[in-house]
């Protein structure tokens, strides 16, 4: 046996041309001769067992090769690769034949299918089924799921066999590779209309509901009818009425209808508390039947815009906030008798709410509406709430500037907190400015919220004062009424029904006030309609 002494240092990269191969005598007594080495040589790797003959040792990877894979560097030709070919059309089976009503069991092989292959052409192994519902090619080894670019993906099958233009019938299989490309009412999988929708409203609503919605005006529609008129695009916008934190309000009417209504569009909020407030407003208004509560017509959800629309009574006179600011712009002042009618309407509305065990919690000029004939109505019950058996609540909801001191300090409160807000509102309209601070200085009340709330709690209440330089004088009864509303001790503050018995209120009930004429003068209407 020849021993390569020049390569005994274990370096296979040493040049071979400068080495000599001396003849070493063989020991015939030893059947397995061992090469003689002068000194141990450092090894770069573990020795590969087995006789290698005269070939120099090669470096190898320490990771054993897979038994199913050809060894690295081997010269032996492996078996021919199985290249998947497009199966014949008769052999191709979609997971659920369109028209079948029974969904097949996933990974259940077809009796006529070859071993290792499902009826749809994929592996019967659960590993061969991808999350997107496509199947990998078969290679006899239970291959892993292929990527979205595989030639055997759902899109490839559909394009190869012209399946894109087919109109399937029946229930699509949720695990079908091609069934997800279709909807039951469109081609190419574009439409998302549900099965059995009959291409329109007829599937979602019965004929009687459709006929009623198409022949009714806004006052006679229920919530289902409002959804129908919304889907049929029968709501016509006539103009904007304003925007606020709660949403935008537009003046609308239905096609073919006569009733003009206000449509309040609210963008839904993921906060569950906000959703509860919106639902509370809708549900409460459904049961209201008072001339001093803004009438509710209905509401609907628009899934395409994620908004809630609330249709309510349109009050042509506008809000008290817009009215008194217009009077101020014109250089006038709202009279005491008009203020008395406004106070009466607000207290009547609060009395109705108290009977229903409801707190408004957001009385302010912008939430008091006037109709063209002068009727006073409360609106915006998004922050309204039920109170308990003692008539108390303890949540901090509403506009902070008009809150009663007990609400600002976090104490329990009752319906009398709305009486405080009524007094602040009347004082603001009478003076043409927000009543805090009481001395009339501009303390940036809307900017410094903490300072303002501290002032309301700690400082004396503002009082209604005469303005001799402007020729404005208020009655003593009116001044006392404001003081009674702004009583800081809630236990001494009057209930709404009790405030209706105040001498100022009983005195004004005997006087006739033409509220319609007042609004006509404010807004410059040509032909006043109605009077009160």
UniProtKB/Swiss-Prot annotation:
Q: List the active-site residues.
A: 362 (proton acceptor)
Q: Kindly list the positions annotated as binding ATP.
A: 241-249, 264
Pfam families for the chain: Pkinase
A single Gene Ontology biological process assigned to it is: MAPK cascade
What's its EC?
Answer: 2.7.11.24
Q: What happens when the gene is disrupted?
A: Does not affect significantly the growth rate but produces fewer conidia. Inhibits significantly hyphal growth upon high osmotic stresses and in the presence of cell wall stress agents such as Congo red, calcofluor white or SDS. Accumulates chitin at the hyphal tips. Leads also to a looser distribution of spacers.
Q: One MF term in GO for this entry?
A: ATP binding
Reactions catalysed, semicolon-separated, are:
L-seryl-[protein] + ATP = O-phospho-L-seryl-[protein] + ADP + H(+); L-threonyl-[protein] + ATP = O-phospho-L-threonyl-[protein] + ADP + H(+)
Q: Where's the Protein kinase domain?
A: 235-505
Q: Which InterPro entries match?
A: Kinase-like_dom_sf, MAP_kinase_kinase, Prot_kinase_dom, Protein_kinase_ATP_BS, Ser/Thr_kinase_AS
Statement: the UniProt record of this protein carries the keyword Transferase = yes
Q: Which Gene3D superfamilies match?
A: Phosphorylase Kinase, domain 1, Transferase(Phosphotransferase) domain 1
Which keywords accompany this UniProt record? ATP-binding, Conidiation, Kinase, Nucleotide-binding, Serine/threonine-protein kinase, Sporulation, Transferase, Virulence
State the family it belongs to.
Belongs to the protein kinase superfamily. STE Ser/Thr protein kinase family. MAP kinase kinase subfamily.
Function as written in the Swiss-Prot or TrEMBL entry: Mitogen-activated protein kinase kinase, part of the mkh1-mkk1-spm1 MAPK cascade that regulates regulates vegetative growth, conidial formation, colony surface hydrophobicity, osmotic stress, cell wall integrity maintenance, carbon and nitrogen source utilization, chitin distribution, septa formation, and pathogenicity.
How is this protein named in the record? Mitogen-activated protein kinase kinase mkk1
Native species of this protein?
Cytospora mali (Apple Valsa canker fungus)
